C-alpha cells in the first residue's frame, strides 16, 4: 500500500511556503552546501529515530528542509517540511513513523526553489499501487532531458499551482513509472545509466532500501553495519553517531539493495572516480572519512602546506571557525607561529526562513563571529579561512579584526582561487560574482583580491598542494571549480542554473516544447 507524502503533514500544510529573495549576508558569501542522505534497514530498531539522528549528523549539508520516509512492509509514510531537522520533527511525529526501513534527507537547493513541494524525500505511487520514496544528494546535468521524458510519459504536471521542480522529483517519477512493469530494482538498473551528473541516491519501497552513487563518485556515500541491520549515509560521521560500524564506501556506478536476504550489489556503469576535492576543504564534517582519508587530517595537512607555500612573519595564527580551524592548526604547526583562538562563533546562527531586516543584514558577519579582543589586540595575525567566494565576508572580517586591535592581517586561504561554478551539487555564485575572476592575470588577481578585502598580504594554497593533502590521485578528483576542467559534459540547459525545471515547466505551460533546451550539446562554461 502506498501512502502519499501529504499523509502526516497537517502541521506542515499551513506553512507550504516558497522562500525567495535575499538570504543573510554570511550565507551569500560562502560556498553553499548541497544535501545529506541517510538510509537504514533494521527490523526491530526504531528506524525513524535512527534516521533523525543521522540527519542531525548531516545537518551541515543542508538547512532548508528535512524529511523522513518509513515503511513497515505494507505502506510507505513520508513526513517533510521546511526548516532544520530539529524544527521539522518532534517526539510525536517520530513515534507515529513505525517500520523497519527508512530514508532521510536534509536539503540545500541546487535545483528548484525552496518550497515545501521540493523538500525530500520525494514520493511517487507506482501503477501497481506500491510506493517509492527517494532522497538525492548531487545535481543532474541532464535534468531537462529527463524532465522532457517524464512529461512525455505524463508523469509531471505543468499547470498545477505548485508542482515539484527538482531533478530529484523527476528521478522519483521515472523510477516509479519503470517499476510498473518490473521490480523497483530493475527499474533503477534501467534508469540509472541514462542519468548524467552527480548523484547519491537513497530510495525505498515497502520492504527494501536502495542506495546508489553516480559513475564518477562526485559525492561521498558509505555503507555501515548495525547489530540488526544496515545503514547508508552521505558521511561516515553519521554512521558513528547512530552506532553503526563503517563497512566500505559505496563504489561509483554501484547500486545496493538491502532487504531480508542481505545486501546485493550490482554495477550499472563502469566507474570513473572524480570525487569532489571541496569535500575535504569545506563541505564534509572534519570527523568524517572520505576515500580512506580523514577530513580533519586533510585540512591540517592543507594548513601545513599553506605555511610552506605562503610564509609570513607574525605573532599569532587564528582560524575562521569552523572549517578554517584545522588548517590554521596545521599552519601554526609548520610555521612555528603560535596558534590561538581569536574568533568566537555563534553556534546558533544558521540559515533562516525569516527575511532579515536591513538592520540585521548590516550586522553581517558580526552575527556569526566575534573577536576575542584581549587575544588579538596589538598582534600581527595570520587569519586562515577555507575559501574566498565573493570576498565580502573576508572584507568584513578584516575590518572587524582591525577595529579589535590587530596591527597586521595576513589572510591565508586553504583552497586555490574559486573561478568556476559548480554544476555537481554546490551552489556557487555565477562566474561574474566570483572575486577571483575580476582580473585574468594571476599576480594581478592576487593583488586585486588583497586590496579588495583590505588585508596586508594574501596567499592561497596551490591546487597541487591541496590535492596532495587529500592523498588522492589528481586523476580521481574533480577540481572543476578551481581549474574549469569538468569531468561530466555540460548540456546547454546548465546555463539556466538551479531553476532549469521551473523555466521549462513555465515554457510548457505557455505551449513551448519542454525539451527544446534539452539538447545534449556540450557547451563551454566561461568565466
Curated annotation (Swiss-Prot):
Region (Disordered) location: 1-30
Lineage: superkingdom: Bacteria
Binding residues for [4Fe-4S] cluster: 276, 422, 478, 481
InterPro entries the record matches: GATase_2_dom (IPR017932), Ntn_hydrolases_N (IPR029055), PRibTrfase_dom (IPR000836), PRTase-like (IPR029057), PurF (IPR005854), PurF_N (IPR035584)
Record keyword Hydrolase present: no
Pfam families for this protein: GATase_6, Pribosyltran
EC number of the protein: 2.4.2.14
Domain Glutamine amidotransferase type-2 residue range list: 35-261
Molecular function, one GO term: 4 iron, 4 sulfur cluster binding
Keyword Metal-binding tagged: yes
UniProt KW keywords: 4Fe-4S, Glutamine amidotransferase, Glycosyltransferase, Iron, Iron-sulfur, Magnesium, Metal-binding, Purine biosynthesis, Transferase
The reaction(s) this protein catalyses: 5-phospho-beta-D-ribosylamine + L-glutamate + diphosphate = 5-phospho-alpha-D-ribose 1-diphosphate + L-glutamine + H2O
GO biological process: 'de novo' IMP biosynthetic process; purine nucleobase biosynthetic process; purine nucleotide biosynthetic process
Listed pathway(s): Purine metabolism; IMP biosynthesis via de novo pathway; N(1)-(5-phospho-D-ribosyl)glycinamide from 5-phospho-alpha-D-ribose 1-diphosphate: step 1/2
Cofactor comment: Binds 1 Mg(2+) ion per subunit. Binds 1 [4Fe-4S] cluster per subunit.
Active site residues according to the UniProt entry: 35 (nucleophile)
Positions contributing to Mg(2+) binding: 323, 385-386
Compositionally biased residues, Polar residues: 15-29
Propeptide boundaries: 1-34
Main enzyme class: transferase
Protein family membership: In the C-terminal section; belongs to the purine/pyrimidine phosphoribosyltransferase family.
Cited function: Catalyzes the formation of phosphoribosylamine from phosphoribosylpyrophosphate (PRPP) and glutamine.
Protein name: Amidophosphoribosyltransferase
Gene: purF
